């Protein structure tokens, strides 16, 4: 059997493949980790970018950044991006792309979102809101983003979008509740190629986003920052 629904099929010779943990240690069949490949058709590195090459290609092995596992039947399953993993305080890992795509896909009030958890007490979300749609919704209630009452209404609306996936919500059970965001930050600008927060394929560059908003991420793990009506959220909706 060369293929099975949901898999990428079997390895094509002479390509070599292994699954590794965050320390580069090879994992046994069935365990999920980073997909690492080697072979004559695998790229040798990045053009005129030795730093990225050193991070990605080691001893001829290409660390793809993809998350997956090999089944006992020798079938490869790709499950997301390895470097985007949420990591809970007890070390459990989860790929956030499905949640992020669902939030953006079902909500007209969320343009972009990135989830974050790096061995932290809870998961947080960085949200780029769709201010135009929020303003249209608010207009029916004679509210605007020009005053605090209106901004609090918009923040509450964003919270309701996140809560649709929690217990009692429209999409309850779609994702494990422990990985859903407990709080969120409203960002002042979108992720773009110009600010290098998305790449040419329109994928988020998580490292850049985390670096740019490191202070804000830390703030969300404080008692003040965990409150959705914190001053930073109110200011970023102006």
Task: Give, region by region, the residue ranges found by the protein language model.
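Conserved C-terminal "lid"/linker of ANL adenylate-forming enzymes
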Residues: 112-114, 121, 165-238
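Conserved ATP-binding/catalytic segment of the ANL
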Residues: 25-30, 34-88, 229-236
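Hydrophobic beta-strand positions
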Residues: 18-19, 69, 197
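Gly/Ser/Thr-rich phosphate-binding loop
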Residues: 1-3, 16, 108
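Active-site loops of AMP-binding adenylate-forming
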Residues: 1-6, 21-22, 49-52, 131
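Short Gly/Pro-enriched turn/cap motifs at secondary-structure boundaries
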Residues: 2, 6-11, 26, 57-59
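AMP-binding/adenylate-forming catalytic core of the ANL superfamily
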Residues: 39, 44-45, 67-175, 179, ...
């Amino acid at each position: 059997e060369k293929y099975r629904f949901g898999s990428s099929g079997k390895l094509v010779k002479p390509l070599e493949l292994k699954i590794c943990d965050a320390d580069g240690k090879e994992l046994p069949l069935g365990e999920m980790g980073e997909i690492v490949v080697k072979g004559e058709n695998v790229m040798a590195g990045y053009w005129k970018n030795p730093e990225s090459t050193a991070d990605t290609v080691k001893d001829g092995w290409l660390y793809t950044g993809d998350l997956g596992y090999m089944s006992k039947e020798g079938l490869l399953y790709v499950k997301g991006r390895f470097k985007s993993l949420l990591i809970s305080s007890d070390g459990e890992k989860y790929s956030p792309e499905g949640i992020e795509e669902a939030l953006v896909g079902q909500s007209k009030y969320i343009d972009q979102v990135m989830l974050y958890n790096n061995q932290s007490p809870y998961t947080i979300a960085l949200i780029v809101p769709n201010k135009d749609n929020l303003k249209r919704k608010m207009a029916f209630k004679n509210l605007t983003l020009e005053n605090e009452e209106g901004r609090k209404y918009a923040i509450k609306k964003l919270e309701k979008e996140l809560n649709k996936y929690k217990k009692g919500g429209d999409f309850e059970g779609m994702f494990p509740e422990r990985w859903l965001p407990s709080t969120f930050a409203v960002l002042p600008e979108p992720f773009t190629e110009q600010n290098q927060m998305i790449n040419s394929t329109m994928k988020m560059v998580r490292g850049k986003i985390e670096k740019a908003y490191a202070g804000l991420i830390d703030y969300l793990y404080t008692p003040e920052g965990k409150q959705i009506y914190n001053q930073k959220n109110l200011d970023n909706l102006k």
